[in-house]
């Protein structure tokens, strides 16, 4: 059971990839973590983690299971919106339900959790909300338009909340990873599987580029460390870009100094389109 002294965290997507790394690191630093998964049995053996069954695609699941976790914890010092998965396919032929599902999981679900967590943070006069977005919010990934757009929406939502909240002791932070070596693509829903000809070749090029980049990318430990720093800081930066040197430092700086046309040209070359 959690002690009264330990800080309590509600973390979505805790059973794999970045979320699992965050759960392990925070648990190892004395936090008690309520970690969500659609398969909570995967978290049974992770120290200091209380498994929570939660499906971000279902509003009732969010409300009921967060409320149960809040009753158990008493209060949450930190909310980390991390869970998510992608959808890969051409936007022009992507089914509408795929677009809706991406925004439900990546935008509406996190927004609902923020609404649920904020009242107790306001009552206590303190708290931290961390939203894990993606560098795709700034540099959209071809054939992952719904994912890129949803992450961009979550980024803007985070900034808007920070501006309108006006409570300095409740910190609102965006953690924006670039490519990270995780099983993310194993969980990506591939649509347009019957694409042929030029479309098929373009999609194949982007997918293979992404797979190469992910294989050579930093481990999720760098994201977990950024989250730990943000949680422990009294005045964390509003946005933390995390990843390899080029993606985390060079690309964001270059984007501020270049035109949209040039950025799109570079992205096409990057993905060999």
Where are these regions (language model features)?
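Substrate-binding pocket helix/loop in short-chain dehydrogenase/reductase
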Residues: 90-91, 98-103
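Residue(s) in the substrate-gating loop at a strand-loop-helix junction
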Residues: 134
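C-terminal beta-strand-loop-alpha-helix "lid" module of Rossmann-like NAD(P)-dependent dehydrogenases
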Residues: 164-214
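A short, exposed helix-loop element centered on a Lys and neighboring polar residues
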Residues: 114-115, 159
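Active-site helix of classical SDR
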Residues: 114, 150-153
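Conserved glycine-rich cofactor-binding loop
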Residues: 15-16
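Rossmann-fold cofactor-recognition segment
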Residues: 47-60
């Amino acid at each position: 059971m959690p002690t009264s002294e330990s800080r309590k965290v509600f973390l979505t997507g805790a059973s794999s990839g970045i979320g699992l790394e965050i759960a392990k690191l925070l648990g190892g630093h004395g936090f008690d973590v309520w970690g969500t998964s659609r398969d909570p049995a995967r978290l049974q053996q992770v120290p200091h983690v209380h498994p929570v069954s939660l499906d971000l695609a279902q509003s009732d699941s969010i409300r009921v299971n967060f409320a149960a976790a809040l009753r158990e914890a008493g209060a949450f010092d930190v909310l980390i919106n991390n869970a998510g998965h992608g959808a890969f396919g051409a936007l022009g032929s992507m089914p509408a339900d795929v677009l809706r599902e991406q925004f439900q999981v990546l935008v509406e679900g996190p927004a609902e959790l923020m609404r649920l967590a904020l009242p107790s943070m306001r009552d206590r006069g303190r708290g931290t909300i961390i939203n894990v977005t993606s560098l795709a919010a700034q540099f959209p990934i071809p054939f992952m338009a719904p994912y890129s757009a949803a992450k961009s929406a979550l980024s803007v939502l985070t900034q808007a909340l920070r501006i309108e909240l006006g409570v300095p002791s409740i910190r609102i932070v965006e953690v924006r990873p670039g490519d990270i070596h995780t099983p993310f693509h194993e969980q990506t829903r591939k649509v347009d599987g019957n694409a042929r000809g030029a479309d098929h070749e373009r999609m194949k090029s982007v997918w293979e580029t992404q797979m190469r980049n992910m294989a050579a990318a930093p481990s999720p430990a760098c994201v977990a460390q950024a989250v730990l720093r943000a949680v422990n800081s009294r005045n964390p930066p509003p946005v933390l870009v995390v990843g390899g040197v080029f993606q985390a430092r060079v690309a964001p700086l270059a984007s501020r100094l270049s035109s949209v046309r040039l950025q799109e040209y570079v992205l096409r070359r990057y993905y060999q389109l």
